[in-house]
Amino acid sequence: MLKGIHPALSPELLKTLAEMGHGDEIVLADAHFPAHSLHKNVIRADGISIDILLEAITPLFEFDAYVDAPLLMMKAVEGDSLDPNVETRYLNAIESAVGFTPNLTSLERFDFYTRAKQAYAVVVSGEIAKYGNIIIKKGVTPIL
């Protein structure tokens, strides 16, 4: 155990976050997401909701400042509905952890899947909210 590291972060997830470079993306996927059929680098975070993962990850993670929206979520399929509180819950978790909320946009379902295939890794969470997936784009970490 490391001091100052959120207990929701597994050693595998910490290693992955450290390996990622600027411009790399990571998918925080809900429990329904077809992670293993879309990606070879899948990390399990069973039982942990995405808002908790966001609270744990974002203090360690610089958001990409060179894109309009470093956060991407999945749009509901036409005729289906999604709970707007999911997005609010995620943005509140980020705000709570880092003091601001980066821009967020949404992608159609299959565009989201295509983008997820290109990500550095997919983290399968215990999130059960429908359309509860989010992609985070890593930025350049400032040198202090």
Swiss-Prot record:
Active-site residues per Swiss-Prot or TrEMBL entry: 22
Broad enzyme group: isomerase
Quaternary context: Homodecamer.
Cellular-component GO terms for this entry: cytoplasm
General function of this protein: Involved in the anomeric conversion of L-fucose.
This protein's pathway: Carbohydrate metabolism; L-fucose metabolism
Reaction catalysed by this enzyme: alpha-L-fucose = beta-L-fucose
Coiled-coil region: none
One of the GO biological process terms: fucosylation
Protein EC: 5.1.3.29
This protein's name: L-fucose mutarotase
Residues where substrate binds: 30, 109, 131-133
Pfam entry (one): RbsD_FucU
Similarity annotation: Belongs to the RbsD / FucU family. FucU mutarotase subfamily.
Species in which this protein is naturally found: Haemophilus influenzae (strain 86-028NP)
Subcellular localization(s) per the UniProt record: Cytoplasm
GO molecular function: fucose binding; L-fucose mutarotase activity
Lineage of the species this protein comes from: Bacteria, Pseudomonadati, Pseudomonadota, Gammaproteobacteria, Pasteurellales
Record flagged with keyword Acetylation: no
